[in-house]
Regions:
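Short, charged, solvent-exposed linker or helix-capping segments at domain edges/interfaces
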Residues: 47-48, 119-122
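Short, conserved beta-strand element in jelly-roll/cupin
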Residues: 56-73
Length: 129
């Protein structure tokens, strides 16, 4: 069975998303993508839009744990309230969101692989523009 320390996961999804570099380390195990995010302040709104995600929102549900920092989540064009997950918290953010990292953050995520690949491919496209 596969196992790894978060900071030993392959950088940029083992080359699938080179622009992410060491800020997003991930590997696909079965139907899940295990990811470790280390980022400074980042608002993904424009990345989703420029990458061509439908409605400018992330289509991947995210399940995770925050080691430090925080993640703010908005749900555009819905009546869902914004959320803020902080250190020591586990989270689930359904598809249809925008992620905003208001401060340096380290988080471990377990995501459906296909859905995450669509999101990361879009972010890669946006970064290449």
């Amino acid at each position: 069975m596969p196992h790894a320390k978060p900071d030993e996961l392959p950088s940029g999804g083992a080359g699938r998303w080179p622009l992410a570099g060491d800020n997003f380390r991930s590997v696909q195990w079965g139907d899940m993508e295990v990811g470790y995010t280390t980022t400074g302040p980042l608002d993904c709104t424009e990345l989703y839009r420029l990458g061509g995600l439908p409605g400018g929102v992330c289509t991947c549900p995210h399940y995770g744990y925050i080691f430090e920092g925080s993640i703010r989540v908005t749900y555009p064009n819905t009546d869902w309230p914004d959320e803020l997950a902080g250190p020591g918290e586990v989270y689930f953010f359904p598809a249809g969101h925008v992620l905003i990292y208001p401060e340096p953050t380290r988080a471990l995520e377990l995501n459906p692989a296909f859905a995450l690949q669509q999101c990361m491919d879009a972010m890669q496209r946006a970064g290449q523009r």
